[in-house]
């Protein structure tokens, strides 16, 4: 039995859409964002969270990684830069430039 890789870093992306786009963007983000991240070598896990707020819909994608090097293979040298999906400009109220990065303690 092999041990699963230990999570050392999490990468958190946050985006907002109009409330009317909640379901449509959920499907799009899951299919073209979450599923893509799941297939990236080195990725341990990825989860999508969503919530309807008073005046918008909010989404978070949290990906779990064993090392900065594993993230870099996916994101490039600056591991905090956002990698937008092709249709994000059609949905998102603003295009975030960076993700949050946390070391798991």
Q: For each predicted feature, which ranges?
A:
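Low-complexity, intrinsically disordered short peptide segments enriched in small/polar/basic residues
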Residues: 7, 34-37, 59, 68, ...
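A broad, low-specificity signal for short, low-complexity segments enriched in glycine/proline
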Residues: 5-11, 20-26, 59-64, 97
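Short, surface-exposed, polar/charged, turn-prone segments marking secondary-structure boundaries
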Residues: 39-43, 64-66, 73-77, 87-93, ...
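Short, well-ordered beta-strand segments in beta-rich or mixed alpha/beta enzyme
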Residues: 9-16, 45-77
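Short low-complexity stretches enriched in small and charged residues
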Residues: 14-22, 27-31, 53-58, 105
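Short amphipathic alpha-helical segments
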Residues: 19-45, 79-88
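Intrinsically disordered, low-complexity acidic/polar segments
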Residues: 1, 22-24, 70-72
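Glycine-rich beta-strand-turn "strand-cap" elements at beta-sheet edges
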Residues: 1-7, 47-57, 83-105
């Amino acid at each position: 039995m092999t041990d699963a890789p230990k999570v050392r870093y999490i990468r958190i992306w946050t985006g907002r859409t109009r409330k009317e786009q909640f379901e449509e963007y959920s499907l799009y983000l899951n299919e073209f964002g979450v599923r893509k991240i799941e297939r990236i070598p080195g990725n341990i896990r990825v989860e999508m969270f969503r919530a309807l707020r008073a005046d918008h819909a909010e989404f978070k994608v949290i990906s779990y990684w064993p090392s900065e090097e594993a993230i870099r293979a996916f994101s490039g040298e600056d591991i905090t830069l956002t990698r937008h999906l092709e249709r994000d400009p059609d949905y998102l109220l603003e295009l975030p430039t960076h993700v949050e990065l946390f070391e798991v303690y």
